Structures are given as structure tokens and as C-alpha cells.
């Protein structure tokens, strides 16, 4: 699968749904991400069977936290690449534009040790969403946690989240994603909320497709 084909697949998302989900994924509140979100204890025996079949497992969640009406949850996907390869892709913050739908920029700045800022931009027609993420790499856990820099412009009320990759059977990787977001109120929000929830939790699937496309591209280059 070429990069162009992969981007065409991602561009087929509902425009309205992605306008919000794009901002939702990366616009994060100042509070630190909950460690409980990153746990694999939520996976049941049936979930593990579904994962083994190559399916995406999603667990939606709602939570009221102060004035914030949060929704999101967790999702998991097995990827047919070694964990070391998945981690290289995950910690390459400037490469996020390659697997976040409609992303056109992911520029890294102020990188000091494990911390970095990432200026994200998503575009679709006249829609142009920008924000700066404060990210932390946790190599010992194979995780990236992120939150919005609220001193910069942002298009969502609140949220936070993480990516994580771990070794799985037969030299594969279990990728997990979790986020809780408050996208605000209004008639438009109430209409798109179900689609946003679903697409937000599909992020591990799109990460998987990106890595598979990278592998195919590398093999073609060698041949």
C-alpha cells in the first residue's frame, strides 16, 4: 500500500466527525493523564480472542470531572511488527502527520530530554485546526502521554490521553490508546458526538495501517 493510497483511505472519514475528532485527539487539558487508562487489566478473555483475530477492541467511557463532561475510553489493536519497530514510529513525533487523519503538520520544538512540544495542524477544505501539544516520552513503558498547551490557541474544552506499545506473541505488538475529551456543548456537538467517540477510539487501527504501509514501501524500495 502506497502513502497516497493510505491517505485516500483516511480521507474518506466523515468530514464533520473528523473536524471534532482531530482536535479531540490532541487537545488535552493540563491535568496529568490517568495511569488507570493505560492498564491492560480491562481486557477480558473474549477481548483477547478478538485481538488475536486481528480485530480492534474498543471500550467507550463517560466521566464527569468538575465542570468537564468527558467521553472517550480505551482501544487496543495487535500489529504485525516487532515492538521495537512500533516504538520507533510512536516516538517519532514529527511523523504523527503520517497516521493522524487529515494531519498536514506535526512540527517538533522545545525538545529537552523526554519532553517536547508538537505543533499539530489538520486541514480539510476551509477547515484549519491548529494546536500545540506538550508530550512526554516514557521509554521504559513504551508510552507517549500528551496534553494541550493551554497558553496557545486550542479548539476543545478539555482532554488528555496516551499511546502505548508493548511486545506481544510471535514478535508482534499490542498497541493501546486512551483518551478522555470534552468537546463542548451545542446542537452540532450533540449530533457528531457518537461519530467522534467511535473514530477517536479507532486510532490504533490507523496506526497499524500506517506501519503496514511503511513496511510495504520499504520492501518495494529494496526490490
Question: Where are the predicted features?
Answer:
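Short Pro/Gly-enriched beta-strand edge/turn motifs at strand-loop
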Residues: 58-60, 115-118, 142-149
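Hydrophobic ligand-binding cavity/cleft-lining segments
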Residues: 36-111, 202, 223
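Bacterial N-terminal signal peptides
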Residues: 18-31
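Hydrophobic-ligand binding "helix-grip"
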Residues: 39-41, 47-50, 124-171, 180
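A conserved amphipathic terminal alpha-helix motif
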Residues: 174-176, 180-223
Amino acid at each position: 500500500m502506497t502513502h497516497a493510497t493510505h491517505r485516500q483511505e483516511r480521507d474518506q472519514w466523515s468530514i464533520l466527525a473528523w473536524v471534532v475528532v482531530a482536535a479531540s485527539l490532541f487537545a488535552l487539558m493540563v491535568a496529568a493523564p490517568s495511569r488507570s487508562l493505560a492498564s491492560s487489566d480491562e481486557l477480558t478473555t473474549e477481548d483477547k480472542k478478538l485481538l488475536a483475530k486481528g480485530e480492534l477492541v474498543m471500550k467507550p467511557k463517560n466521566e464527569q470531572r468538575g465542570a468537564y463532561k468527558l467521553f472517550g475510553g480505551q482501544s487496543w489493536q495487535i500489529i504485525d511488527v516487532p515492538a521495537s519497530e512500533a516504538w520507533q514510529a510512536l516516538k517519532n513525533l514529527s511523523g504523527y502527520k503520517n497516521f493522524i487523519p487529515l494531519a498536514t503538520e506535526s512540527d517538533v520544538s522545545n525538545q529537552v530530554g523526554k519532553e517536547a512540544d508538537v505543533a499539530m495542524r489538520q486541514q480539510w477544505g476551509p477547515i484549519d485546526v491548529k494546536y500545540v501539544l506538550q508530550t512526554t516520552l516514557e521509554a521504559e513503558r513504551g508510552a507517549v502521554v500528551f496534553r494541550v498547551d493551554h497558553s496557545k490557541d486550542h479548539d476543545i474544552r478539555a482532554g488528555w490521553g496516551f499511546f502505548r506499545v508493548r511486545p506481544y506473541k510471535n514478535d508482534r505488538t499490542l498497541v493501546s490508546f486512551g483518551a478522555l475529551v470534552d468537546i463542548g456543548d451545542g446542537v452540532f456537538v450533540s449530533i457528531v458526538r457518537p461519530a467522534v467517540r467511535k473514530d477517536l477510539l479507532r486510532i490504533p487501527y490507523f496506526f497499524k495501517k500506517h506501519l503496514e504501509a511503511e513496511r510495504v514501501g520499504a520492501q518495494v524500495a529494496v526490490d
